[in-house]
Amino acid sequence: MFSLQGYDAFLGFLLISAAVPVLALVTNKLLSPKSQTGERELTYESGMEPIGGAWIQFNIRYYMFALVFVIFDVETVFLYPWAVAFHKLGLLAFIEALIFIAILIVALAYAWRKGALEWS
């Protein structure tokens, strides 16, 4: 029959990892001050009175630049283990990595052509 004997540690870890955030939220709710003043709802700006509103619209160029950064950051995450194990992987892994890099170069050229890297 099926035995759960080997999963005792995992079950304990699961229960503790679920109980700690719940306990933190309940403790915060019980110990936090209950008053809502107008000053408490103000935006905090480095200890000074806020200047202007906190809700401003960012230019889309910042989002495009961040998206390109994330794409090439993920590229680094994939290529680093490949570079570490390069000698053990063989020719097929080398060709696959070249195809992966070629696809990313095409993506960079596309982003460059569309102006995602321009700040002017």
Curated annotation (Swiss-Prot):
It catalyses: a plastoquinone + NADH + (n+1) H(+)(in) = a plastoquinol + NAD(+) + n H(+)(out); a plastoquinone + NADPH + (n+1) H(+)(in) = a plastoquinol + NADP(+) + n H(+)(out). It is found in: Cellular thylakoid membrane. GO terms for biological process: photosynthesis, light reaction. It comes from the Bacteria. It is an enzyme of class 7 (translocase). GO terms for molecular function: NADH dehydrogenase (ubiquinone) activity; quinone binding. Its main location: membrane. The keyword NADP applies. InterPro entries: NAD(P)H_OxRDtase_bac/plastid (IPR023043), NADH_UbQ/plastoQ_OxRdtase_su3 (IPR000440), NDAH_ubi_oxred_su3_sf (IPR038430). GO terms for cellular component: NADH dehydrogenase complex; plasma membrane-derived thylakoid membrane. NDH-1 can be composed of about 15 different subunits; different subcomplexes with different compositions have been identified which probably have different functions. NDH-1 shuttles electrons from an unknown electron donor, via FMN and iron-sulfur (Fe-S) centers, to quinones in the respiratory and/or the photosynthetic chain. The immediate electron acceptor for the enzyme in this species is believed to be plastoquinone. Couples the redox reaction to proton translocation, and thus conserves the redox energy in a proton gradient. Cyanobacterial NDH-1 also plays a role in inorganic carbon-concentration. Belongs to the complex I subunit 3 family. This is NAD(P)H-quinone oxidoreductase subunit 3. It comes from Prochlorococcus marinus (strain MIT 9211).
